[in-house]
Amino acid sequence: MTTNLPRRRLLKTTAGATGAALGGALLPLSGSTHAAAHRFAIGDKDFLLDGKPLQIRCGEMHFARVPREYWPHRLKAIKAMGLNTVCAYLFWNYHEWREGKFDWSGQRDAAEFCRLAQAEGLWVILRPGPYACAEWEMGGLPWWLLKQPGDAFLRTRSPAFIDPARRWLREVGRALGQQQVTRGGPILMVQVENEYGFFGSDLDYLRTMRRAVLDAGFDVPLFQCNPTNAVAKTHIPELFSVANFGSDPQAGFKALAAVQQGPLMCGEYYSGWFDTWGAPHRRGSADGAVRDIQAMLGANGSFSLYMAHGGTTFGLWGGCDRPFRPDTTSYDYDAPIGEAGWTGAKFDAYRAGIRPFLAPGEVLPAAPARNPVMTIAPFALTESAAVLANLPARTIRDASPRPLEAYDISRGLVSYRTTLPAGPAGTLEAARVRDLAWVFVDGRPVGTMDTRQRRYKVELAARAAPVTLEILLYTIARVNFGREVHDRKGLHGPVTFTPKAAQPVAQAVEQWEIRAIDFDADGVLPPLAFKRGRAAGPAFWRGGFEAGRGLDTFLDMSGWGQGIVWINGRCLGRYWSIGPTQTMYLPGPWIRRGRNEVVVLDLTGPREARIAGLAEPVLDRLRPELDLARPPSSARLQLDGVKPAFEGEFAPGAATQDVRFAAPARGRQFCLESLDAFDGKQYAAVAEIALLGRDGKTLDQSDWTIAYVSSEEASKEDGGALNAINGQNSDYWHTAYAGAAARNAVHPHRLVIDLGGDAEVAGLRYTPRQGEEGVTGRIRRFRAYVGERLVVGN
């Protein structure tokens, strides 16, 4: 273990011509064995380092998403962009996957990451959770919390959550307390919780979390972050507040100034956005970002780019957007430093935009060179092992399936087997399936279940004799945002079979045998019996390639279906040929000289069992025709004779607005009808819709789905309707504007949400598309409907 590195007074900080505080004071320097302690404080107008103003120019990088061997390279790039601080999440589940067993070794060595940042002249902002979000499995919360009953205890003062969270934070203090600036390290500030305003309103919960961080031994300033429209909701005097946004810094800073005196800071400025499987690759405007960054710096504000460098969600750590949209393995984020650490035009634009705000005499170092890449000639995977023939012998027997967590299974592949008696054709149905399932009768595939569409039914043919029913379930990711983080996996009972009859009666399907391949924390492969040739059904495949040296490459998985890749026993991550990502980043340090073994799990079967290594990634190729088969939709809007629950106009601008109905309305479905937009154009857009109950609180969205949408943009950008109910203000539903789909996409536009059950709706909360004044799609006149069946068909 290395010792802490020293600091020197590199520059004196004075006010520049722009009026911005300069950010070059007291930067870390490598080379000495003694580190000086510093005082960091939050002043009336500035952050103060040893009593002098410090303007924080920060960028986010998650060490868990970057090979340890490349941490220095990425930190050098962050420094070269003009930043003086790196922001780092800790993911609780990454360090405590099994309760009470902490791991800070190797890739998880957060203290070493801090030391390396200090050596590169960077300060550190630490975000230890306990909740993180970050498109990470369960938002960083450990799965074993879900062994406790209930769907409303996470991120609350319930002892079932608070007690293990306190223990986690004590462990963080033990591991990283010496990395604070007060003890000669680089950590300036520590965040408490994360965007709690998106989730709850219990201010005493925030106070409890603050106390837990203090009790863990942190003595640097503590802060909380929230989106602009939630800053006031959860602000408490004991915690400094920063605002998160991807546009309109003036509004964000205004919200901060309304609740506290002190420096202005954007805690997350979105340089791009994350990708989800099956949706277009997302990008962020460099020009708009540079304008906003300069506006913040010119206003004496500080910022943190989310992300400066996104990297890759290696292994099985990817999260899932609500209601259920799994995130891609690539976490490129369209950040200024690309997935493989590359810098280019976007990086150069950010660097040029920040340069005028450097301290006098502060010099930007050159960006590090790209790591070299190599191509790999196509190689065949000639051996396979059927999943159902390679399940472990350990069998769990249960009358009705329960969530995996109840069986102490974390994630992976799970087989559920039982016997169905002879009988007529009918419908097999589970209460819930998390996440995807393939149904077999006597070994023959008969259908799939898919939580993305809440499709938990499969039609079964008549049976002349008893048959073996087997359901193979695959867990993809736990939801990382909203109340849906209570995301218990597996086949949830009761499971029923309803025969086709004049008066059908559902029959319980019971007495299940359950066997699982638990991939655990690091996606460890089970023992597998490979044979030459192609196995039937879901299978593991094995092959390999020779390498003279280890250089970065991008594995082309476009010929495969859906599953996981391992290289030399290391779990590289998930792939899915529906896109938009078609390649998998393989870092050079993970490639051996000589023979390299590759194992691929493919659940739907490869079209060609070959892989090649490419010199560049493919991040933006959609293949919807390769998705799981689903019944064709016959959904039709049916508003004839339905009286609107409300008709009126939204206010202009980007602020969130509450609309209360004259009288509550009851039904299962809600329709927002856009009649026109403020800009007079044919488009409609919504960042977020929530519904209000009589008490003014938002209704639970856990079982919401989109029942119907008249138009959505799906080619130029991800303007899908699900964006309107995913809890994120930074993306949005947008009606079609590109190609043939746009020609008939005119007002009125309708979006129908199925609430998952009967509900009383007393109003709605509408968040317009965010951005500069004049962005397209902000709705002016509208109608709101509530009814039992506003959409007919399936």
Model segments located where?
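Active-site neighborhood of glycoside hydrolase catalytic domains
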Residues: 164-232
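Aromatic-lined ligand-binding clefts that engage carbohydrates, nucleic acids, or primary amines
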Residues: 425-440, 469, 545-568, 575-576, ...
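Aromatic-lined substrate-binding rim segments of carbohydrate-active enzymes
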Residues: 73-79, 87-136, 214
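Catalytic-core region of carbohydrate-active enzymes that cleave or remodel glycosidic bonds
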Residues: 246-336, 342
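Short beta-strand-plus-loop segments that form exposed binding edges in beta-rich domains
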Residues: 471-476, 600-605, 673-680
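N-terminal carbohydrate-binding accessory modules
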Residues: 35-84
